[in-house]
Amino acid sequence: MEGGGGGADGQAQPVAQAPPAMQPMQQLSRYESQKRRDWNTFLQYLKNHRPPLTLARCSGAHVIEFLKYLDQFGKTKVHASGCAYYGQPSPPAPCPCPLRQAWGSLDALIGRLRAAYEESGHAPESNPFAARAVRIYLREVRDAQAKARGIPYEKKKRKRTQQQQPPPPPPPPPQHQPGAAAGEASSSSSAAAAAVAAEGSGSSAAAAAATSQTGGGGGGSTTTTTASAAAPTTATRV
């Protein structure tokens, strides 16, 4: 009988599916890795807090409490006001002043926790890391450490991108003034006229010299006649 048997041929064999390929884990940047560690540290702090504290009830005062708690793990020497090395950036000898968290480290930590709080789905308006009390506390820590360590903290100014201006045009070539050109032309004309006059006087002198020589050879009458002819006749006949 066909169809009566329930053997292996009549049953649908399940298709063996290949296991899903494991997607390579995206490597986090150094900032993202540090932000995740800081966030886990803060959540662990809330868990160990006495009395117990939830993230929803956390305020700016609790954040300041957390920052003071981290001071015990600090590595920055902050001199007390009565220390002999107060205000010296490089003390010559060790002192019993406590180690604290540096202001720069705390400021960067708050920035990462503020971003992690909002990335976890919480509203920015309820962000305890952005509270005004936290900003005031960080400012006080900065000023106190600057005086105690003798290292002023200067806020870095962002460099503004300056618009590239075209280079200035080259200076125009020097132009001759009309008066100067006229003066040069007149001086050139005067020089030319003086040269012509000099040539004329030279020719006259040469002619006179030649006449004198001719007269000397034939007798004194020629010289006298030439001189008389050359001199103007101003006398009037009576």
Swiss-Prot record:
Feature: compositional bias, Low complexity: 10-27, 177-213, 222-238
Biased amino acid composition, Pro residues: 165-176
Which segments constitute the ALOG domain?
30-157
Q: What is its main location?
A: nucleus
On whether Nucleus is a keyword of this UniProt record, the answer is yes
- Compartments, record wording: Nucleus
Instruction: Give the InterPro entries listed for this entry.
Output: ALOG (IPR040222), ALOG_dom (IPR006936)
Please provide, in alphabetical order, the Gene Ontology terms of the cellular component aspect for this entry: nucleus
Keywords from UniProt, A to Z, are: Developmental protein, DNA-binding, Nucleus, Transcription, Transcription regulation
PROSITE patterns of this UniProt entry?
ALOG
Q: What GO molecular function terms would the record report?
A: DNA binding
| Biological-process GO terms, alphabetical | mRNA transcription; post-embryonic plant morphogenesis; response to light stimulus
Motif Nuclear localization signal, per the record, lies over: 155-159
Quick one: where's region Disordered?
Answer: 1-33, 147-238
Top-level lineage group:
Eukaryota
The yes or no answer to whether the keyword DNA-binding is present is yes
Briefly state the protein's biological role. Probable transcription regulator that acts as a developmental regulator by promoting cell growth in response to light.
The family classification in the record reads:
Belongs to the plant homeotic and developmental regulators ALOG protein family.
What is the protein named?
A: Protein G1-like8
Species whose genome carries this gene: Oryza sativa subsp. japonica (Rice)
